Amino acid sequence: MPQLSLSSLGLWPMAASPWLLLLLVGASWLLARILAWTYTFYDNCCRLRCFPQPPKRNWFLGHLGLIHSSEEGLLYTQSLACTFGDMCCWWVGPWHAIVRIFHPTYIKPVLFAPAAIVPKDKVFYSFLKPWLGDGLLLSAGEKWSRHRRMLTPAFHFNILKPYMKIFNESVNIMHAKWQLLASEGSARLDMFEHISLMTLDSLQKCVFSFDSHCQEKPSEYIAAILELSALVTKRHQQILLYIDFLYYLTPDGQRFRRACRLVHDFTDAVIQERRRTLPSQGVDDFLQAKAKSKTLDFIDVLLLSKDEDGKKLSDEDIRAEADTFMFEGHDTTASGLSWVLYHLAKHPEYQERCRQEVQELLKDREPKEIEWDDLAQLPFLTMCIKESLRLHPPVPAVSRCCTQDIVLPDGRVIPKGIICLISVFGTHHNPAVWPDPEVYDPFRFDPKNIKERSPLAFIPFSAGPRNCIGQAFAMAEMKVVLGLTLLRFRVLPDHTEPRRKPELVLRAEGGLWLRVEPLS
């Protein structure tokens, strides 16, 4: 009886081949990965069915392209908050799901989860990495926790108090320009352009103790920061350039590298100069000299910071934190100030009440400067700032990637691996959270009204362990700038209504134009 064997079939030599074994192992590994991904995807789809979703464009695109960085995109976000009330599921293509959240009840489990469980989503933030490094904005895990603990003293009120003089000086320079431009009665100004330069001027003095006179003449360093912000925004809108290799072949990618190098060289030079000063003076003499000038800048605080084990930050870490503060501190504050001036121009009765509050505070004072202790004496002006931050939050959304299942108060579960988009704008415009959300009403922030709602109904600085570490700095600067601006100028609306444009921060298409009239 004939016997069948591998050799008789001519298969034995191939079966013994190491290449075939390698191919089988590789194919098995790939098949296992595909099956695991398919199971996870199917399981997530089943678990996401409890979240409502708006109609898709089609099965392949999902909801991709339904929201643009435009006025219409913001209006669509408002409609989602109105329609769904708390949250919805959003598909980017056929595979990628995002849970968009619009309600304080469901924001809390995500933002207040430990930072290791819900780190920031890296898709967009990765564009900033070559510029900002592993600063607080982009770092994660133990490194983020260590840096957060070490940086917290930099924002203590004793450190912030001396910055008030810098805020006053910088806004005085901006106002001197406005007085010249309005010498014939009034001037039409793009608030973003003027206020961005002013905030960068203040930050450069607070971070580096360096005065570039950028409000009066061009500064290469300031121009590089503005260019980097614009290039990151532009790249975000070009999906093919998400790939680093392709991006750095383009003229924009090369400009980005040059601007990064310039910014890093400036920061490194300041750090090295301080490093040389410290050994020659000693820490005690250095602090004594700083005490006489009453100002410790951000670089000083970082150089002197130590963790629980007595370890200091490296020069690379210090550069990352300084560059992060320059990036995060100028655009967000400029956006907040520009929009509050817009609202007060549209509501002259609130503008006049703010002006009277500042006049009463400074009536017997020369020069007219706002000091740290004055900040608590401007309650109505503070209410106006907060209501503007509600309607026009500088950062319209923040994202988190769930590294484990997040259980919501109603029992629903956001599966591991899903990105949560906390819609700050949607929450602030949600009629289930804020009655008549489109009305500018500063009295929402009257102390007696605040206690009636969730603290997470108002989150312009985010919330939880990864909230904005510089919010006290930002609020202090906004109060000084707004108070002195209203003391010296009447702000009037422009004839064209701005169209909002969410980029890195909430801007206006073509600038936010207002008219200013000197009061004396």
From Swiss-Prot:
Its cofactor is heme. Pathway: Lipid metabolism; arachidonate metabolism. GO terms for cellular component: endoplasmic reticulum membrane. The keyword Cell division does not apply. Heme binds at E328, C468. It is a single-pass membrane protein. It catalyses: an organic molecule + reduced [NADPH--hemoprotein reductase] + O2 = an alcohol + oxidized [NADPH--hemoprotein reductase] + H2O + H(+). GO terms for molecular function: 20-aldehyde-leukotriene B4 20-monooxygenase activity; 20-hydroxy-leukotriene B4 omega oxidase activity; arachidonate omega-hydroxylase activity; heme binding; iron ion binding; leukotriene-B4 20-monooxygenase activity; long-chain fatty acid omega-1 hydroxylase activity; long-chain fatty acid omega-hydroxylase activity. This is Cytochrome P450 4F3. It comes from Homo sapiens (Human). The gene is CYP4F3.
